[in-house]
Amino acid sequence: MSKKVNNRTTEYPIDDIFLKRYSPRAMSGEKVSEKELMTLFEAARWAPSSSNIQPWRFIYAMRDTQEFENLFSLLIQFNKDWCVRASVLVVTISKKTTDSGRENATHSFSAGSAWQNLALQASEMNLIAHGMSGFDYEMARKKLGVPDDYTVEMMIAIGKHGKIEDLPESLRPRETPSDRKPLKEIVFKGKFPA
């Protein structure tokens, strides 16, 4: 039995939390409080992690600060056009090694789990958390002093919902929940298809 929420239809019934979450860009510029932000990071903290290594780290900056301007400067122009109304910018990084110095092959995967928890919590709190890859990774590493044994993974724009009219006209048609590939394209029994 399928389910429809937010103009998204599932092939099997799942909890609404997964269908409600999407990545809008229209933000109001209104401040997200420190308490709201720490609640998002608390959700991220409880993500599953291989061997409980918890390799994720977050560097954040609040709007109207020099730190925010530093993070904003890392973005490509496309993302600057809509992130101008974000309340918080976050750089997600992950530690490539364990505490004993061994390689952690799943550090990026674990950081992705933490990001997913943060995104779901934001959706539950009626906040936007929009993940981005469009930024200067090497400049982020330099500006933020990220050590060599860490990988810069992604950036996140966090904010309160705004008006679609405040977005550049070219982005307005994209301000809707997107669909997903059917299960038959992503799930294979026994081995990868030929």
Sequence positions of predicted segments:
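Acidic, surface-exposed loops and disordered segments
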Residues: 1-194
